[in-house]
Amino acid sequence: MNSHYQNHSLENFFSTNLSATDDAVFAGIQAEFTRQNEQIELIASENIVSKAVMQAQGTCLTNKYAEGYPGRRYYGGCEHVDTVEAIAIERAKKLFNCEYANVQPHSGAQANGAVKLALLQPGDTIMGMSLDAGGHLTHGARPALSGKWFNAVQYGVDKETLEINYDDVRALAVEHKPKMIIAGGSAIPRVIDFAKFREIADEVGAILMVDMAHIAGLIATGAHPSPLPHAHVVTTTTHKTLRGPRGGMILTNHEEIIKKINSAVFPGLQGGPLMHVIAAKAVAFGEALGPEFKTYIDSVIDNAKVLAEVLQTRGCDIVTGGTDTHLMLVDLRPKGLKGNKAEEALERAGITCNKNGIPFDTEKPMITSGVRLGTPAGTSRGFGAEEFKLIGHWIGDVLDGLVENPEGNAEVEQRVRKEVKALCSRFPLYQ
């Protein structure tokens, strides 16, 4: 190989692959790929990105510091990353039909933190959905910054319907007069009425923030009503149903708000943006603007309904009786099971999900009375209704086996794992 390097180690630095330079890390990555390829992923917050998104994230853009915003950077040499970030911003605005977008937050939690930094003061009252009802840590949960720096009031769900009771939300808002009301969550299977939330916010003079992280893909395709006509500010992750890289984003239609948001993201909360991730976000937004993405989201929702229906026939209780979205909560109490034990048994059988509290759960967060299931990742790899019927019955088999033997039913779990592996081999990843 011809080169001008005086030091041969530099030649290796620029040319040698990971497998040759760090076999320990390479082995870990390969093992994780095998796990993803051979198991069924039902964690509702996970998805599978396209090869193009993955390629964009693994580029030389990781080398570039770009503190600031396009056209207003603190470093030189940013003309090309400016172009990439501008593409991401314009595509995000088009995708969600809004006026302004900040694509720099490293995560959904960072996006939520930036909104609070921009629009609130420590000690202000905020109102968000409680964790046990389907909310998120960043919406005012005690262990999180949002629960420590602010006077956090939590709303829940109706004891009968297990859905949001907007009259109860209004009564709580009138009583506590929050500076900000947060709508959205991490385990809400039904459509959220953002217009009703805005009415309540206006009545008490509150800012309405919507966290659409879980349903951003549904909103992008019109499968769920958009919060943008109603919310003052909207946050989201860029993975989950949006099927992009792990990251966050903030959207608004208000110029005075985006100015505060931009200052809160940088220099308020973050330093240099991750330009390789922003490039991957731009690619994912471009994919989501195509007609294939709408077909994908429609299938995600259809598959979720199929899975919920099969589980109901197998004696599982689905919280709210079904789902309008990509996810469902399975109440395991009728089977006498705990969420942590069900999660472990399903993983032994090659099906990955997460234990999850259900509304009014009396179990501890690391135990729980339920599991949360979602269809985005399975749908991304090509599973349709017939495959999700099989998956529903496999879950039923594993849970019934666990009822018979609370320590795990090896015979059932090994049989299901073999069938899972055979199904996954028909829908391989990145071939």
From Swiss-Prot:
The cofactors required by this protein are:
pyridoxal 5'-phosphate
Pathway in which the depicted protein is active: One-carbon metabolism; tetrahydrofolate interconversion; Amino-acid biosynthesis; glycine biosynthesis; glycine from L-serine: step 1/1
- Where N6-(pyridoxal phosphate)lysine occurs, the residues are 240
**Gene Ontology, cellular component aspect:** cytosol
Q: What is its main location?
A: cytoplasm
Q: Where is the signal peptide?
A: none
- The residues listed in the UniProt record as binding (6S)-5,6,7,8-tetrahydrofolate, with positions renumbered to this chain, are 131, 135-137, 256
The reaction(s) catalysed by this protein are: (6R)-5,10-methylene-5,6,7,8-tetrahydrofolate + glycine + H2O = (6S)-5,6,7,8-tetrahydrofolate + L-serine
Single GO MF annotation: glycine hydroxymethyltransferase activity
EC identifiers of the protein: 2.1.2.1
**Record's keyword annotation contains 4Fe-4S:** no
> What InterPro entries does the entry give?
PyrdxlP-dep_Trfase (IPR015424), PyrdxlP-dep_Trfase_major (IPR015421), PyrdxlP-dep_Trfase_small (IPR015422), Ser_HO-MeTrfase (IPR001085), Ser_HO-MeTrfase-like (IPR049943), Ser_HO-MeTrfase_PLP_BS (IPR019798), SHMT-like_dom (IPR039429)
Family annotation (Pfam families): SHMT (PF00464)
Q: Where is this site: Plays an important role in substrate specificity?
A: 239
Q: Where in the cell is it found?
A: Cytoplasm
For this UniProt record, the keywords arranged alphabetically read as follows:
Amino-acid biosynthesis, Cytoplasm, One-carbon metabolism, Pyridoxal phosphate, Transferase
Subunit structure, as described in the record? Homodimer.
**Membership in a protein family:** Belongs to the SHMT family.
Protein name as annotated: Serine hydroxymethyltransferase 2
Organism from which the protein derives: Vibrio vulnificus (strain CMCP6)
